[in-house]
Curated annotation (Swiss-Prot):
PROSITE patterns: MR_MLE_1
Record-annotated membrane-spanning stretches: none
Family classification: Belongs to the mandelate racemase/muconate lactonizing enzyme family. RhamD subfamily.
Superkingdom classification of source: Bacteria
Protein name: L-rhamnonate dehydratase
Annotated organism of origin: Klebsiella pneumoniae (strain 342)
Lineage of source species: Bacteria, Pseudomonadati, Pseudomonadota, Gammaproteobacteria, Enterobacterales
A GO MF label: magnesium ion binding
SUBUNIT field: Homooctamer; tetramer of dimers.
Chain sites annotated for binding Mg(2+): 222, 248, 276
Encoding gene per record: rhmD
SMART domains: MR_MLE
Keyword Magnesium tagged: yes
Active site, per annotation: 325 (proton acceptor)
Additional information: Reaction proceeds via a syn dehydration.
Length: 401
């Protein structure tokens, strides 16, 4: 079989600070008013009163969605979305394009390595540049799958289970339980600047949900980098009587010694997890060495599917789980092939968590949602990632090459 070459790469954005607000899509923080994801949630900025109530107040949604499309010389296209917005468009169109165009559609690892090395001097340890690179990598996998007529999970070696089971992240674990999810992860609302009173309030929330959900439904806390070791340790022990399954991302990404100490001091049986905002393979190797229980890379932020597969191997070698941060189809096709991913995350993007809404709505067409907390592998059997780009969205292409 003679495979085509890549003829064009294009980058659009939607939403963010230079477009319409509340566009949703790949930047799932870019939601409208009265949404749980922008309510009073603890963040590293919560210590400043003017930025405590709303995450959008400090600019969590300024980037917007990046859309990368790659076109082969036979006319077939692949695409992906992530969070990088207009700045990501510049990086793709003015820098990364030279490593993509003219390559065979199967040259994914070569392109990935060239992009990584070419951006080392300004990429740092992740962030915007890595989000952009990840989006390109995912678009390449989508194109390759569509060219050969196979879903991405089969390109990775095939499924190791018949279905993916999910826990739900959102403000209402009790509603997630009614929908058939195996657990519910809530955001914390208070942090070290609130002292013991903050701990008592978050513990009261956990206790209330435990009473509503019964003794066996999983409950977890997402702390979103907002704590220090002492506060996180006190919170974990205060929640232990309510059978908290894990405490997540208590510390900023680079505080590896802090994660090691938190794991050492955590209550017996309670897992410590992190990784959503780590952005390189090397950072995940170091994170793994802290002994945490679950690593949680975001496939749209960590280097793409190519890097996610490598992260899963690091975790597997140490007997750790890898449960990616919710990334819809981009993580579905990966985790169904990982033996150390027994469940996955579904992010509730409906404002009140009362209905199931596709995570990247409205940018993806055909994006599946769990049924009774599960997605069967047959749902993933379309070529590539199995979704199409909604070109009715307000897509802007600010740069061309």
């Amino acid at each position: 079989m003679t495979l085509p070459k890549i003829k064009h790469v294009r980058a659009w954005f939607t939403g963010g600070a230079t477009a319409e607000q509340g566009a949703g899509g790949g930047d799932y923080h870019d939601q409208g008013a009265n949404h749980w994801i922008d309510d009073h949630i603890a963040t590293p900025m919560s210590k400043y009163k003017e930025y405590e109530q709303s995450r959008q107040s400090f600019g969590i949604n300024v980037l917007g969605t990046l859309i990368v499309e790659v076109e082969a010389d036979n006319g077939q296209t692949g695409f992906a979305v992530s969070t990088a917005g207009e700045m990501g468009c510049f990086i793709v169109e003015k820098h990364l394009n030279r490593f993509i165009e003219g390559k065979c559609v199967s040259d994914i690892k070569l392109i990935h390595d060239q992009m990584l090395n070419a951006t080392l001097y300004y990429a740092g340890s992740g962030g915007l540049v890595m989000n952009t690179l990840s989006c390109v990598d995912l678009a390449l996998w989508d194109l390759f799958g569509k060219v050969v007529g196979l879903p991405v999970y089969k390109l990775l070696g095939g499924a190791v289970r018949d279905e993916i089971q999910f826990y739900a992240t959102g403000a209402r674990p009790d509603l997630a339980q009614e929908m058939g999810f195996i657990g519910g992860k809530m955001p914390t609302h208070w942090g070290p600047h609130d002292g013991d009173a903050g701990i008592r309030k978050d513990v009261a929330m956990v206790a209330d949900m435990r009473e509503k959900c019964g003794p066996d439904f999983w409950l977890m806390l997402d702390c979103w980098m907002s704590q220090d070791v002492n506060y996180a340790t006190k919170l974990a022990h205060a929640c232990a009587p309510y059978n908290l399954k894990w405490i997540e991302e208590c510390l900023p990404p680079q505080q590896y010694e802090g994660y090691r100490e938190l794991k050492r001091q955590a209550p017996a049986g309670m897992m410590v997890t992190s990784g959503e905002h780590h952005g390189t393979l090397q950072s995940f190797r170091t994170l793994s060495e802290t002994g945490i229980d679950i690593m949680q890379p975001d496939v749209g932020w960590c280097g793409g599917l190519t890097t996610l597969v490598e992260i899963a191997a690091i975790a597997k070698a140490r007997g750790q789980l890898v449960v990616p941060h919710g990334s819809s189809v981009y993580s579905h096709h990966a985790v169904i092939t990982f033996t150390n991913t027994p469940f996955s995350e579904f992010l509730m993007t409906s404002p009140d968590c009362a209905t199931l809404r596709p995570q990247f709505d409205p940018i993806l067409l055909g994006e599946p949602v769990p049924e009774r907390g599960r997605i069967h592998k047959s749902v993933l059997d379309k070529p590539g990632f199995g979704v199409e780009l909604n070109r009715d969205c307000n897509l802007k292409r600010p740069y061309q090459h």
